[in-house]
Amino acid sequence: MTSTQDLTQNRLFDVKGFIAVVTGGGSGIGLMATQGLVAGGARVYIVSRRKEVLDDVAKKYSQKGPGEVFGIKADINDPNDIENLAKELEAREPKGINILINNAGVTQEAEKKGHASSVDYHSADSVRSWLEGNGRDVWQQTLASNLISHHFVTARLIPALDKGSSIVPGHSSSIINISSISGTVKSTSAGQYAYAASKAAFTHLSRQLAHTLYPLRIRVNCIEPGLFPSEMTTGGSDENQKSKIEGAGSKFPAGRTGQEADIASAVLYLGSRAGTFVNGETIHVDGGM
């Protein structure tokens, strides 16, 4: 019989001592996930191509504890970097890892987004020109960054996640894939078709991996965020690797856009004992979009 003590929030959502890896963990939603895990006491390895971001985040957010942040420089689009990432994690965490958050991603359709309001949707030529606007290269690069890279990072880290599933008794390792509400909604996403399609595919890949990996006691779930401040949505970040969105909260019941606590709470739920019986699911953290 479960005791009342086992149902306290400190027990259910505790990640103290957990080992987590967050790709793209140096800014935006990845940093929000990192903050939540560090606040819960986890050891977090953030992965980025930008060493200056890794060093800055590790220094600033480790000081706030109780967990720790470590940076590993890697481009997850590069198979050699994925291999080096895995080997470094194996050397530093021989008992394995508990949580993998696949978050790194790109959108390369800013120009189409900027012209979405000027498209004549009653003109075949206008629509065709808009749809063809960025060409095949943008599609291929977007799919490579937002889908293919995550598949191969996950595959390479399965042995470490397998080991990690036995670290915490009665628990299992957790993969949390950060997709986007753009992969679900029917709107045009302001013309970011490659981005939206890559995220829809990533959400479905998450379900397939959940079915594939359950014999190893590795869970796979997906978070689809809505409008959050990030370098992708605002174009930049401040000295704390944070971004801001002004005046867009009126359409949400919360009266604001997404914040750190919204991502952190979903990550802690899926990564902790609280989410042990949750697998193959998608959580929409979108304010009701």
Where are these regions (language model features)?
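A glycine/serine/threonine-rich, flexible loop-to-helix segment
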Residues: 11, 59, 114-117, 189-190, ...
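Conserved glycine-rich cofactor-binding loop
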Residues: 19, 24-28
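Conserved glycine-rich Rossmann-like NAD(P)H-binding loop of the short-chain dehydrogenase/reductase
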Residues: 40-56
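The beta1-alpha1 cofactor-binding region of Rossmann-like NAD(H)/NADP(H)-dependent oxidoreductases
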Residues: 51-52, 73-88
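C-terminal substrate-recognition "lid" of short-chain dehydrogenase/reductases
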Residues: 94, 256-285
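Catalytic loop of short-chain dehydrogenase/reductase
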Residues: 106, 112-143, 151, 158-215, ...
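Short, small/polar-rich loop/turn modules that mediate ligand/substrate recognition or access, typified
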Residues: 214-219, 278-280
